[in-house]
């Protein structure tokens, strides 16, 4: 399978990729070396700004343009550090960058910055999105124009601080059956316990999805859990190597919704499929085997008549896990038939 390192002159990761006009835009996080200690909370991932890259033509061959810094942590009034993953969506000719960063209390939230152009620069809102938490936003625009944000990441991403509230048993039919009750108690658990030892036979902690407001600046509803189920329709367990850990991505093909994600400490990218944006999503397959480096994070896009997987690894940095490099590879169309 052909692959390519997209931007070998700098360390970037966590690519969110979209086609605006006839050009493909890549919104990565921007890795840097700070000497911070390695830990399970990701303290060594000290990113402070975002760039945008773009190309036109075959991603395996086309020249990649770096449009420079589009947002720096010093521009964001509420954020102190760790500008982790981000994504961009277009609505009515404006571009909305949704990003994750830590506030001055050490808590991750999602923020929004706005631009008139896909290459930025982006102007941040003064405050984070009300009720937002954790990391790794993916912003998906459905065919009817509704915009959804998928988010969440365990361990350093703090998702384990939050617990879903009572929801109906997952059903593979009908958009309205899942998440009809408030799905999360907003705000960190009082003791902020990092439960890294969830029993293997307990349901896996889910990511979340929320519909965005018409102005794309706030949540329009309470976040709902994204439930991934097995072939019997049962939620995946915490001990399943295919359960969710971080790095949500959503795309649509042939009328179906494909939720892909990283499994974290089992180091896989996996694919699940559902019939509506809220899920549940039935586990389908592994997309990518473990790469060099601890994390694996991606996006999937159709461009130039093919499906492409954008991701990262740590081969160029000799396996320094917080210095990652962007890659691209084609995917088989049969995955989404």
Residue ranges and their predicted role:
Residues 1-337:
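Carbohydrate-active catalytic/glycan-binding domains of CAZyme proteins
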């Amino acid at each position: 399978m052909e692959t390519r390192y997209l931007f070998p002159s700098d360390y970037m990761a966590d690519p969110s990729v979209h086609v605006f006009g006839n050009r493909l835009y890549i919104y990565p996080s921007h890795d840097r070396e700070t000497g911070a200690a390695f830990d399970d909370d990701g303290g060594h991932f000290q990113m402070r700004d975002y760039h945008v890259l773009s190309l036109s033509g075959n991603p395996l061959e086309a020249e990649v343009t770096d449009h420079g810094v589009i947002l720096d942590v010093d521009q964001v009034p509420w954020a102190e550090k760790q500008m982790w993953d981000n994504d961009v969506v277009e609505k009515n000719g404006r571009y909305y960058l949704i990003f994750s960063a830590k506030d001055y209390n050490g808590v991750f939230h999602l923020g929004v910055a706005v631009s008139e152009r896909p290459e930025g620069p982006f102007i941040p809102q003064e405050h984070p999105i009300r009720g937002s938490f954790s990391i790794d936003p993916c912003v998906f625009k459905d065919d009817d124009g509704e915009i959804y944000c998928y988010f969440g990441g365990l361990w350093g991403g703090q998702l384990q601080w939050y617990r879903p509230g009572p929801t109906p048993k997952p059903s593979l039919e009908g958009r309205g059956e899942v998440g009809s009750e408030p799905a999360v108690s907003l705000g960190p658990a009082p003791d902020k316990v990092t439960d890294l030892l969830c029993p293997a036979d307990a349901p896996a902690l889910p990511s979340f999805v929320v519909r965005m407001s018409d102005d794309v600046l706030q949540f329009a509803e309470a976040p709902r859990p994204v439930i991934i189920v097995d072939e019997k329709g049962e939620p995946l367990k915490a001990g399943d190597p295919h359960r969710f850990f971080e790095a949500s991505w959503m795309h649509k093909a042939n009328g179906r919704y494909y939720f892909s994600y990283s499994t974290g400490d089992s180091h896989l990218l996996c694919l699940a499929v559902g019939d509506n944006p809220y899920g549940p999503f039935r586990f389908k397959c592994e997309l990518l085997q473990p790469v060099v480096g601890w994390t694996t994070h991606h996006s999937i896009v159709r461009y130039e008549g093919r499906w492409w997987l954008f991701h990262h690894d740590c081969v160029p940095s000799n396996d320094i896990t917080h210095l990652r490099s962007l890659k691209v590879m084609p995917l088989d169309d049969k995955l989404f038939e």
